[in-house]
A protein has these predicted regions:
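Short proline/glycine-enriched turn/loop motifs at strand-loop junctions of beta-rich domains
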Residues: 32-34, 41-47, 104
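Beta-sandwich interaction modules
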Residues: 68-93
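Short, surface-exposed beta-strand/strand-loop-strand elements in extracellular ectodomains
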Residues: 43-63, 67
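Noncatalytic modules at the cell exterior or secretory-pathway interfaces
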Residues: 35-37, 87-107
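Asparagine-centered strand-capping/turn motif at beta-strand->loop junctions
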Residues: 26, 39-45, 100
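Intrinsic-disorder/low-complexity, polar/charged segments enriched in Ser/Thr/Lys/Arg/Asp/Glu/Gln
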Residues: 12, 23, 34-36, 76-80
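C-terminal interaction-tip segments
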Residues: 1-24, 29, 99-119
Length: 119
């Protein structure tokens, strides 16, 4: 048997912000590592969403990595950001935070990890 690895997709689902101005971490699991992270707005939501790092401030832009534009009630193409680690599972989802202009809105967050496979 040959030992191989492949990427397996996983998802946090929608990471919603209960209180605008109070960034919410993607996860509190600081041990989790990922090879790839995808952040996308939820179609139909109406407020801007912000992705950043600990201590981010959407009002000043400090710590903000990306500002996502909403699709609105009419739908449309969802704004997204994909981060990839070319050297394996080096991205730590717990390092990323979401903030929103509208309570209850947020981002859909997916991630990929390398898993062993024996063929």
């Amino acid at each position: 048997m040959e030992n191989r690895e492949f990427l397996q997709a996983r998802s946090f689902g929608k990471v919603a912000v209960p209180t605008p101005g109070t960034p919410k971490p993607i996860t509190t699991d600081t041990n989790l590592r990922a090879a790839k992270l995808r952040f996308a707005v939820v179609i139909g939501e109406t407020g801007r969403i912000f992705l950043g790092v600990a201590g981010m401030n959407k009002a000043t832009g400090s710590g903000v990595i990306k500002e996502f534009w909403p699709t609105g009630a009419g739908g449309g193409i969802a704004d997204e950001l994909v981060l990839e680690s070319p050297n394996g599972d080096l991205l730590r989802p717990a390092d990323y935070y979401v903030d929103a202009n509208v309570a209850g809105e947020g981002l859909i967050v997916a991630y990929w990890v390398w898993v062993p496979h024996w063929a």
